[in-house]
């Protein structure tokens, strides 16, 4: 695998664009075009702009195909990737890879173009021609409705060097360059390929590629040097000029305070760059002088906000010591600097903006008179370039010419940014979106929600049915694998939502709520039609424990044709859910409805029946026994003095007394999990309680509780006291040690250390939510083998214990877990006993056109069943790696005989930025792990990827590497390669020939 990108010839690019558009209706993977009708045009630098947005100088403006994809989707202003005297392999060798991480806020450790400067010039001129012809050919807008802006750096000597000077001259007047002549001649020679582009159109393509420039300088560049370069670009080169300014102009204290208040306290940076970079008191007079110089020459001058914001690598984000922050966390700094300069110059200083712009703020930015606006981080996320279409359409409105920046509006944007939910960091560390499996070479499409669900619910299928208001059908899908739709529709830990691809857009689909909607509307019909399985299996099964695990085991055993008796020690089914979880979390009615499903299945339910002896059950004729006894042994917290109350004991008492437990005025809850949150919220509702303090030895970011549980606790008025460790309880006061977070370890995790300080916290009652334990003594009394930790020895596949006829499920295995994990265990046990699979998959594929229509479209939570429509249909089409690749190096191909699109990685287009790794739902990196097309045998030898190099396109003869073996493959001699991979190779040779160099 080589990180060196190889530009495509103009011939190959034209062939690719025309073939793909004709065969598939797409252009470089973009399914929907933005079409400008000319009624919303703006004018800048004497040229037309159909939209004031486009890609920032960076990964999306480095290659021709990147620029074309961005244009097709809606861009009209292109800030071309920065060129400097260091280029090509020399520069590429300085970049550590992977160099991009954009799964939440963005980071990168790349900088200027990795091409040589002459290559960059050629890429931009090829793009210039392609945009001109597709504008006319595909009806996308006026051939002159877009602008290129060159970006150069980093010092005057480099910019005046022959290499960069030739680049600037060529971009200003390209008619004498060989590439301009070649592109024009090629288009004229093949003018008959076009339906709408004429030879006259081609002849009139102007050679004046750029008349504007953006200056980028390195951190620490002296103000005198910045001014000299800008003056040179204005006076000697005659460019309209933007100078990039950094957030460091705001000062260290402002930046640190803003980041901390917004939840980015973990982002580390010192004050070095703030002191070393351009200072505000130097910037203002410099910018004033440059504005005056530009005005004297009838040119425009402004600032580009913002340049990079360097931060320290602390959690192994990227293989570098320093990286550049972008996206949602950069926005509050960038817009604050824009507001500050707008006020300083009374709006007279033009601002070209980049720094966390996206669909949710771009309209307000432009309305404030801040444009053009360029984006990068948002395009690196799923949806990719297609996100531009939504932004461009949003700005389809009457446009006034630029007069000045509205300083007041810019100030409001800055004020709003620090509280904007799209920019504030989540309270907790984000969970991994990855599955614990590697991406396959074929058929990698997957619904991450289903894979993340312990019972593999067919989520996309029932969401589609709920969206169509087919509740009965949705319930049939749900109940196939889940006998507790009301319980899981109310309190499920919903790991599915953590895996939802929508997390990379805005917020996950509210899957749990959609399940509950199906249950509320389809329950009666399901119950009426629910078949009662005949008893077809010999023997009887006893299930001990009527909590979620026991209920699930009984349900699936009945589905499997077993006669089942369910023993529950208490008066009703539900276990911890019914007897402990507070009523404000789940109602008795919801639990009872799930219990009714078991009754309909004719499970013999025996409440108020405590089982002490397994031998007694065997004597009663039960041939198989399932232990779903939970984790009833109370965990303990040892203090030097004083005895805390157990959380589950309190919650049960709270429920029994309707919130009239004797607690006093001050209650302290110790713990940071979901049970601790339930406990604190219940205590807050308890009669006589005035203050509830939740104590945890680390910060809330590291609490194990789900974020929504933390939020609800805070909303209920629970007072969090972080970085405290309890010592002793005396006279209504809890003594705590004050802790502090230590630095990050090699895994990126922060520990805690003692500070030596202590504090007293008022505490009439202390409640410890520190976890429960399995009933080891009971297991041993019944002859079952346990580990040193007191846990049952079980077969991981069947959950069979040391007794061949006894199985275990739920919390009784390893301690407290989730309801849906209990259901998983219940089914696993039932299938082991029944000897058959007891639930089938429901794969209802969404229509491809409807799936693609949602890609790149940001949409917040919708009301009622419309929320189901936010599902991206990943079970039908995933293609995250295709969408997020700036270079179009991951291609979705349609292979005859294969149901879904297959992914091919194109080696020569990849620079190993690693962005596709962040968004692949597998624990894999598509650029390393997908079947790869190599341009040459030499390229193949320089890589470890599995893939192929085409030796003879006509005969389809290829050199192939497959699982470590390299061999010659031909369609007539396919031995050694799976049929599907052979089909993929043939398809590339036949239908995607433009990929072959």
Predicted regions and their residues:
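Glycine/Thr-rich beta-alpha phosphate-binding loop at enzyme active sites
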Residues: 22-38, 251-347, 382-400, 641-642
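Glycine-rich phosphate-binding active-site loops on the catalytic face of alpha/beta enzymes
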Residues: 76-87, 245-247, 364-391, 931
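C-terminal helical cap(s) of enzyme catalytic domains, especially alpha/beta-barrels
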Residues: 88-108, 380-404
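Ferredoxin-like iron-sulfur electron-transfer modules
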Residues: 432-452, 474-494, 526-543, 578-579, ...
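Iron-sulfur cluster-binding cysteine motifs and their immediate structural context
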Residues: 447-469, 489-519, 565, 572, ...
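Glycine-rich dinucleotide-binding loop and its adjacent helix/turn
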Residues: 519-535, 593-608, 613, 634-686, ...
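FAD-site-proximal beta/loop scaffold in flavoenzymes
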Residues: 642-665, 729, 744-816
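A conserved FAD-binding loop/helix module that cradles the flavin
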Residues: 812-837
């Amino acid at each position: 695998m080589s990180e060196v990108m190889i530009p495509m010839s103009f011939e190959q690019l034209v062939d690719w664009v025309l073939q793909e558009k004709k065969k598939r209706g797409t252009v470089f993977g973009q399914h929907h075009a933005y079409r400008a009708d000319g009624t919303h045009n703006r004018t800048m630098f004497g040229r037309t702009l159909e939209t004031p947005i486009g890609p920032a100088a960076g990964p999306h403006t480095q290659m021709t195909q990147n620029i074309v994809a961005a244009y097709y989707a809606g861009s009209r202003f292109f800030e071309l990737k920065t060129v400097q005297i260091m280029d090509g392999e020399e520069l590429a060798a300085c970049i550590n890879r992977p160099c991009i991480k954009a799964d939440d806020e963005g980071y990168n450790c790349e900088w200027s173009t990795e091409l040589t400067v002459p290559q960059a010039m050629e890429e931009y001129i090829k793009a210039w021609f392609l945009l001109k012809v597709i504008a006319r050919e595909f009806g996308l807008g006026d051939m002159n409705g877009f602008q290129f802006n060159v970006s150069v750096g980093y010092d005057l000597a480099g910019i005046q060097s022959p290499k960069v000077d030739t680049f600037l001259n060529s971009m200003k007047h390209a008619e004498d360059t060989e590439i301009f002549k070649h592109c024009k001649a090629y288009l004229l020679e093949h003018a008959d390929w076009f339906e709408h582009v004429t030879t006259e159109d081609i002849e009139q393509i102007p050679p004046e590629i750029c008349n504007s420039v953006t200056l980028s300088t390195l951190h620490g560049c002296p103000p005198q040097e910045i001014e000299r370069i800008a003056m040179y670009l204005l006076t000697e080169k005659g460019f309209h000029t933007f100078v990039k300014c950094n957030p460091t102009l705001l000062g260290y204290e402002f930046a640190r305070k803003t980041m901390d208040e917004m939840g980015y306290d973990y982002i580390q940076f010192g004050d070095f760059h703030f002191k070393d970079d351009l200072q505000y008191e130097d910037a203002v007079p410099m910018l004033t002088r440059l504005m005056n110089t530009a005005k004297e020459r009838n040119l425009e001058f402004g600032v580009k906000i913002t340049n990079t914001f360097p931060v320290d690598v602390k959690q192994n984000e990227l293989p570098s010591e320093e990286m550049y922050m972008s996206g949602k966390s950069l926005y509050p700094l960038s817009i604050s600097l824009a507001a500050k300069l707008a006020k300083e110059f009374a709006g007279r200083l033009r601002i070209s903006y980049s720094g966390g712009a996206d669909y949710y703020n771009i309209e307000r930015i432009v309305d404030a008179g801040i444009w053009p606006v360029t984006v990068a981080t948002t395009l690196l996320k799923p949806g990719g370039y297609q996100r531009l279409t939504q932004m461009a359409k949003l700005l389809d409105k009457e446009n006034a010419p630029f007069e000045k920046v509205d300083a007041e509006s810019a100030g409001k944007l800055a004020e709003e940014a620090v509280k904007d939910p799209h920019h504030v960091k989540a309270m907790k560390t984000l969970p991994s979106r990855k599955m614990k499996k590697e991406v396959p070479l074929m058929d990698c499409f997957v619904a991450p929600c289903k894979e993340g669900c312990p019972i593999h619910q067919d989520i996309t299928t029932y969401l589609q049915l709920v969206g169509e208001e087919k509740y009965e059908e949705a319930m049939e899908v749900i109940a196939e694998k889940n006998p507790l739709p009301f319980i899981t529709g109310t309190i499920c830990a919903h790991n599915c939502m953590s895996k939802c691809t929508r997390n990379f857009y805005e917020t996950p689909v509210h899957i749990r709520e959609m399940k509950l909607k199906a249950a509320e509307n389809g329950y009666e019909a399901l119950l009426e039609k629910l078949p009662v399985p005949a008893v077809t299996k010999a023997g009887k099964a006893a299930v001990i424990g009527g909590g979620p695990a026991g209920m699930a085991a009984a349900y699936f055993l009945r589905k499997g044709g077993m006669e089942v008796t369910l023993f529950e020690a208490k008066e009703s089914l539900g276990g911890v859910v019914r007897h402990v979880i507070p009523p404000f979390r789940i109602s008795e009615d919801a639990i009872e409805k799930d219990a009714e499903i078991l009754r309909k299945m004719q499970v013999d339910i025996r409440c108020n029946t405590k089982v002490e002896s397994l031998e007694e059950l065997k004597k009663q004729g039960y041939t198989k026994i399932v232990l779903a006894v939970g984790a009833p042994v109370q965990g303990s917290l040892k203090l030097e003095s004083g005895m805390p109350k157990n959380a589950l004991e309190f919650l049960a008492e709270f429920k029994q007394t309707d919130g009239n437990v004797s607690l006093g005025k001050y209650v302290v809850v110790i713990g940071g999990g979901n049970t601790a949150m339930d406990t604190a919220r219940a205590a807050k509702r308890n009669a006589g309680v005035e203050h509830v303090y939740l104590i945890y030895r680390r910060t809330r970011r590291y609490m194990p509780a789900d974020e929504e549980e933390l939020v609800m606790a805070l909303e209920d008025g629970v007072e969090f006291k972080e970085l405290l460790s309890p010592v002793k309880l005396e006279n209504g006061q809890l003594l705590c040690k004050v802790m502090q977070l230590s630095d990050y370890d090699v895994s990126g995790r922060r520990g805690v250390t003692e500070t030596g300080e202590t504090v007293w916290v008022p505490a009439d009652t202390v409640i410890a939510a520190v976890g429960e334990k399995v009933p080891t003594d009971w297991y041993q009394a019944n002859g079952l083998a346990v580990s040193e930790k007191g846990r049952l020895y079980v077969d991981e596949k069947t959950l069979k214990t040391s007794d061949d006829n006894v199985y275990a499920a739920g919390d009784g295995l390893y301690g407290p877990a989730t309801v849906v994990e209990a259901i998983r265990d219940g089914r696993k046990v039932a299938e082991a006993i029944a000897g058959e699979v007891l639930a089938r998959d429901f794969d209802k594929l969404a229509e491809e056109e409807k799936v693609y229509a949602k890609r790149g479209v940001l949409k917040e939570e919708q009301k009622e069943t419309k929320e189901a429509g936010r599902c991206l249909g990943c079970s039908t089409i995933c293609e995250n790696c295709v969408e997020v690749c700036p270079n179009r190096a991951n291609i979705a191909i349609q292979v005859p005989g294969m149901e879904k699109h297959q992914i091919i990685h194109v080696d020569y287009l990849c620079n190993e930025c690693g962005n596709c790794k962040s968004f692949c739902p597998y624990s894999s990196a598509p650029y390393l792990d997908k079947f790869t097309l190599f341009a040459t045998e030499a390229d193949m030898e320089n890589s470890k990827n599995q893939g192929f190099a085409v030796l003879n396109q006509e005969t389809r003869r290829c050199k192939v590497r497959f699982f470590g073996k390299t061999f010659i493959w031909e369609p007539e001699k396919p031995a050694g390669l799976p049929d599907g991979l052979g089909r993929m190779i043939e398809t590339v040779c036949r239908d995607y020939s433009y990929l072959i160099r």
